[in-house]
């Protein structure tokens, strides 16, 4: 008999999976809105930040193709990782790791290249720390669930 059939799915997997999917869906929406050049979306997202939607879109849309690809891997990898976690697939670990790699590339690019003045500050730093914390947690959590035989 398959050893994974005996492993009961812990209740927290569903909580983590659903919350991570919701969180990462927000990131996916942000990515789509940026790629589509949605000015109205940026008007709501920039409240309290000293930049126009046009300035913000111009900054994000000026990324080189490889950077945009890394951003896509980070965002869509996180969405796929969340779905794979809910499906109890061991591949969630690999996909979350790839997502974290995409996040690392985008973070390093922004640090090396520099960000516009409006994108620097406490709010941006907090958002970056939260994104890194959640992405790291999801990778560790998925790894833990795989080692316990929950992910097959």
Model regions and ranges:
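Topology signature of small-to-medium multi-pass alpha-helical membrane proteins
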Residues: 1-152
């Amino acid at each position: 008999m398959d050893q994974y059939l005996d492993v009961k799915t812990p209740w927290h997997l569903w909580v983590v999976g659903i919350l991570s999917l919701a969180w990462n869906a927000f990131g996916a929406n942000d990515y789509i809105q940026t790629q589509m050049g949605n000015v109205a979306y940026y008007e709501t997202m920039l409240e309290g930040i000293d930049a126009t939607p046009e300035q913000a879109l111009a900054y994000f849309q000026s990324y080189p193709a490889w950077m945009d690809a890394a951003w896509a891997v980070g965002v869509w990898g996180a969405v796929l990782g969340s779905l794979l976690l809910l499906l109890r697939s061991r591949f969630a670990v690999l996909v979350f790791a790839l997502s974290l790699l995409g996040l690392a590339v985008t973070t390093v690019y922004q640090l090396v290249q520099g960000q516009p003045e409006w994108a620097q500050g406490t709010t941006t730093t907090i958002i970056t720390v939260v994104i890194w914390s959640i992405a790291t947690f999801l990778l560790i959590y998925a790894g833990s669930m795989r080692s316990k035989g929950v992910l097959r």
